[in-house]
Amino acid sequence: MSTEKSLLANAAGGSLVLQIFVGIIAGVALAGFSPEAANQVAFLGDLFVGALKAIAPVLVFVLVASSIANQVSGAQTNMRPIILLYLVGTFAAALTAVLMSFAFPTSLVLIDAAAGANPPEGIGQVLNTLLFKLVDNPVNALINANYIGLLAWGVGLGIALRHASTSTKNMLHDVSHGVSQLVRFVICLAPIGIFGLVAATIAQTGFEALAAYAQLLGVLLGAMAVIAFVVNPLIVFLKIRRNPYPLVFKCLRESGVTAFFTRSSAANIPVNMALCERLKLHEDTYSVSIPLGATINMAGAAITITVLTLAAVHTLGIEVDLATALLLSVIAAVSACGASGVAGGSLLLIPLACSLFGISNDIAMQVVAVGFTIGVIQDSAETALNSSTDVLFTAAACEAAERKA
């Protein structure tokens, strides 16, 4: 009996990762035992994701403004190398997806087109949407969680307050600290929230619908695994010149797991901010790089766009040469960086990539519908890769800067 109490005490008071693991097991068990009961606890997951999404825009705006307003003159923020890592990582992901698609060609059973979807007409429209998000009304940006706009206004307000009185800067810092405390409280609810998410997902899908797309999922998840465990560690090693895997596994464990179940990079911003704080990274850096990464660091999206497009190409018997494949990698990488500016994310950028091969919009939308069918796995894995990489590259750039100093 005392042993059981000890185990329960360790689970309740131990690491958040262990508590989340217990929540996952409990969710799977409940869904297997009683799907009806599992559906009844779905609201726990919705509440958790809703709380994260609610606090994230406020956190980003206040933290960015506070960090820049209180920044010491001449301090290094390391943003240039982080942005370069984001872009290199996204392009490498698209290239890896091309190689995986050629190595394991996949045919699709095309289904009805995704009803009501409204994909962008071209890369210009994607970039145009992003540009207008930059000058969005700040109140509207807060309400709609427009992180591009929040970053722009946060940076602008921070710069404007650089020469404000000390009391004003202290007030801004105190507000930032208060919001961070709220975030910590919400993150403590992760095990309960993930329990609800897992139970509801398994009860509602059962994963039977995914069996017909086993090979497609294999290529998608295989490409994401190569990026997470081979390419990203290689990039980080070149940056920090030491074994990257302890950092890689920490980011996947403490950021990727939560992102996998929330399926939202925006909702995972507070989790990533808290992880950066535990890693003792520069607040001036991660307060900007993490929300920026949630917007433009889209390795998972690049893989999804590339793999599904090449699956459609293979299904239709279209020949693809090396030059076209490389061009697809570039288009997928650029499109992925704009995925946050498109309702529906990476899946609705597939018609844009399909147009490179002359595939009609009707067929492209059937490919999108396939994407929605496997979304319970694809979207979760994509978000986990995207979000954990934000912290990984931020930490790598900060460590590299410290090593040079």
UniProtKB/Swiss-Prot annotation:
InterPro entries: Na-dicarboxylate_symporter, Na:dicarbo_symporter_sf, Ser_Thr_transp_SstT. It is a multi-pass membrane protein. Keywords: Amino-acid transport, Cell inner membrane, Cell membrane, Membrane, Symport, Transmembrane, Transmembrane helix, Transport. GO terms for cellular component: plasma membrane. One of its GO terms (biological process) is threonine transport. Belongs to the dicarboxylate/amino acid:cation symporter (DAACS) (TC 2.A.23) family. The keyword Transferase does not apply. This is Serine/threonine transporter SstT. It catalyses: L-serine(in) + Na(+)(in) = L-serine(out) + Na(+)(out); L-threonine(in) + Na(+)(in) = L-threonine(out) + Na(+)(out). It is found in: Cell inner membrane. Involved in the import of serine and threonine into the cell, with the concomitant import of sodium (symport system). The chain crosses the membrane at residues 13-33, 43-63, 82-102, 141-161, 185-205, 217-237, 298-318, 339-359.
